A protein has these predicted regions:
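N-terminal, active-site-proximal structural segment of metallo-dependent hydrolase catalytic domains
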Residues: 1-118, 156-158, 176-180, 315-316
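Active-site beta-strand/loop signature of hydrolases that rely on acidic residues for catalysis
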Residues: 7-12, 36-62, 82-84, 117, ...
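Solvent-exposed loop/turn segments at secondary-structure junctions
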Residues: 12-16, 53-57, 84-89, 126-127, ...
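Short, solvent-exposed loop/turn and secondary-structure capping segments
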Residues: 18-21, 59-62, 90-94, 131-134, ...
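Solvent-exposed, acidic/flexible segments
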Residues: 25-33, 54-62, 110, 114, ...
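A well-ordered secondary-structure block
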Residues: 93-175
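Metal-dependent phosphoester-hydrolase catalytic domains
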Residues: 125-135, 162, 171-174, 200-208, ...
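Active-site His/acidic residue clusters
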Residues: 178-201
C-alpha cells in the first residue's frame, strides 16, 4: 500500500429505468459501463463512493461491477451498500397530487426500490459492523431544519426522511490500524418542486446534517478525526438554483478542508447546460492533502455528464 490514500467519488450515471436492467447491462458489457470501468481503473482509487448506482436486494449489480473492475486490474474486496431511500415507497401521497405509489411518493425519488442509490467500494477493510446508516433519520428531527416552510401535511412530515439517498458514516481501517471515518451522501437536486421550494430546502438540510453531526447536536456522537465528507451535494457554491448557506458553511468550516480539485473545466464536476461543481471530498483539517483532481470520462453522453473527483491524503 502506498503512503497515500486516494479517495474518490463519482456519479457515473449507472442507473436504469427498471430493476435488473443495470445488472443486464454490466453482464453485456454495455459501452457506458465499459467506459466507467476504464475511467475508474485509470484513476485507481483506494476508496470509491459511487453515487447514481442502482441498488438491488442481493447486491448483484454491485458484485458484477466489482468483478468488471477486478478484470480490469482493480480489486475492491470490501463493499458497503445498504438499502437507500431512493425508490423506497412511503405509502403516502408525498407530493400531494392525489395519488400514491409514484416515484415522488418514495422517500427519495425513484421508479423502483434502489434506483440511483450509492455504493462504497474499498481496497482497505471497512468496519461495516460499526458503520452508521442515518437513512431513517427524519427531516423534522434535524436541529435548525427548513422543513417548516416546505408545505408538508402533518402525516407526511411525521414520516419524511431527510436523506434522498442516504447519509453514512463508514470507518475504513488504515494500514496503521486507525479508522478513517467516511461520511458519505448523495443529496436531492434543489429543483423539480414548486414555490414552497421543498427540494431546495431538503437539499440544504442534507448538507446541514453533517454540520450538526460534527457539532454533536444529533443523538449519535460525532465521529473522531480523521474523517472525510464525500459525495454528491447536488449544489454548486455559486451557480444554479439552491440554498447555499449550509454548503458554504461546510466549505469554510475550520474542521474541514476543501482541496478544490480541478480538471479541464476547472472545479466543475457536472455539465447541465453550464459547468457546475456538485461533487465534493472534504477531508478533516488534520489530514495532509497531497493531490486532487477532477477527471472527465470519454464515451457515451450519460457517462460524460459527470466527472470523477479524487483526493490523495497522507496516511495518518
Amino acid at each position: 500500500m502506498a503512503e497515500s490514500l486516494r479517495l474518490a467519488t463519482w456519479d457515473a450515471g449507472l442507473s436504469r429505468r427498471g430493476p435488473g436492467l443495470l445488472l443486464s447491462d454490466i453482464d453485456k458489457g454495455d459501452p457506458q459501463v465499459a467506459a466507467a470501468v476504464a475511467l475508474i481503473a485509470g484513476v485507481r482509487p483506494d476508496v470509491l463512493l459511487l453515487t447514481g448506482f442502482d441498488w438491488d436486494h442481493d447486491g448483484m449489480a454491485l458484485a458484477a461491477f466489482a468483478a468488471a473492475l477486478k478484470a480490469a486490474g482493480l480489486a475492491y474486496p470490501h463493499r458497503y451498500a445498504p438499502r437507500p431511500n431512493a425508490g423506497m415507497q412511503s405509502g403516502l401521497d408525498l407530493d400531494g397530487n392525489g395519488r400514491t405509489g409514484e416515484p415522488r411518493d418514495a422517500q427519495g425519488y425513484g421508479r423502483f426500490t434502489g434506483q440511483s442509490g450509492m455504493a462504497l467500494l474499498s481496497r482497505l477493510p471497512l468496519r461495516t459492523e460499526a458503520a452508521r446508516d442515518f437513512s431513517a433519520f427524519l427531516w423534522a428531527a434535524l436541529p435548525g431544519s427548513l422543513i417548516d416552510g416546505a408545505g408538508l401535511a402533518p402525516e407526511v412530515r411525521a414520516v419524511q426522511r431527510l436523506s434522498a439517498t442516504g447519509h453514512w458514516d463508514v470507518p475504513v481501517v488504515l494500514p496503521s490500524g486507525r479508522d478513517l471515518h467516511l461520511l458519505a451522501f448523495a443529496a436531492t437536486p434543489p429543483l423539480f418542486d414548486g414555490p414552497e421550494d421543498r427540494n431546495g430546502r431538503r437539499n440544504r438540510d442534507e448538507a446541514a446534517f453533517w454540520l450538526r453531526y460534527l457539532d454533536g447536536a444529533l443523538p449519535e456522537p460525532p465521529p473522531p478525526a480523521p474523517f472525510a465528507i464525500l459525495g454528491d451535494a447536488d449544489l454548486d457554491p455559486a451557480r444554479g438554483e439552491g440554498r447555499r448557506d449550509a454548503l458554504a458553511a461546510l466549505l469554510s468550516d475550520p474542521r474541514l478542508q476543501d482541496p478544490q480539485p480541478a480538471g479541464v473545466r476547472g472545479t466543475a464536476t457536472a455539465v447541465y447546460g453550464a459547468p457546475l461543481r456538485l461533487d465534493y471530498i472534504l477531508p478533516s483539517a488534520d489530514l495532509r492533502v497531497t493531490g486532487a483532481a477532477v477527471v472527465w470520462p470519454d464515451g457515451p453522453d450519460e457517462a460524460a455528464r459527470r466527472a470523477l473527483v479524487w483526493v490523495d491524503i497522507s496516511l495518518p
